[in-house]
Amino acid sequence: MRPLAPLTRVALSTLLLALLLVGCAQNEPEFSVSDLPPGDPARGAEIFTEPPGGASCAHCHPLDGERSVGPPLTGYAARAAGEVSGQSAEEYTFDAILRPSKHVVRGYSNMMPGSYEDALTQQDIADLIAYLLSR
C-alpha cells in the first residue's frame, strides 16, 4: 500500500475533523414552539418529577428555591418572561428543554443533557412548558 501524499493526509484530516464537529454539535429541534399543541400543567407536573425518559427535572431543579446542580425554578414564569429580550417565556422554556446550551443561567454550568427531543413527545414538551410557566 502506498503512503498518502501530504496534501491528501491534510484533506482527510480536515474532513474527519469536520465530521467530528458536526457529530458533536447540538441538533436543532425538528419543530418549534409554535408547532406544539396546548399544554396541560397538571400532566407537566408529572413529567417534571417522573418523565418518560427517566431523567427527572426535579432532581437538578428544585422547586423550593434551594441552590442545586441546576437553577431553582421558584418564580420561573416571571424570570423566563424577561430572560432574553425579544423572546417569549414559551420560546425561552422551549430552548431550555431542547437547546439547553443556548441560554445558560448565570452562576451555573451547562450540565443538562443535550436535548430531550428523543425522550419527550411534542405533547410532553407542551405540558412541561405549561407547568413551568404556571410556577
Language-model segments: residues:
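Bacterial N-terminal signal peptides that target proteins for export
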Residues: 2-12
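Electrostatic cytochrome c docking/interface patches
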Residues: 25-52, 86-87
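Inter-heme linker and motif-flanking segments adjacent to c-type heme-binding CXXCH motifs
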Residues: 27-30, 66, 134-135
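Gly/Gly-Pro-rich "capping" loops immediately C-terminal to redox-active cysteine motifs
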Residues: 34, 38-41, 59-96, 114-118
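The canonical Cys-X-X-Cys-His
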Residues: 44, 52-64, 128, 132
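Generic structural signal for secondary-structure transition and capping sites
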Residues: 53, 101-105
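C-terminal capping alpha-helices of c-type cytochrome domains
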Residues: 91, 112-135
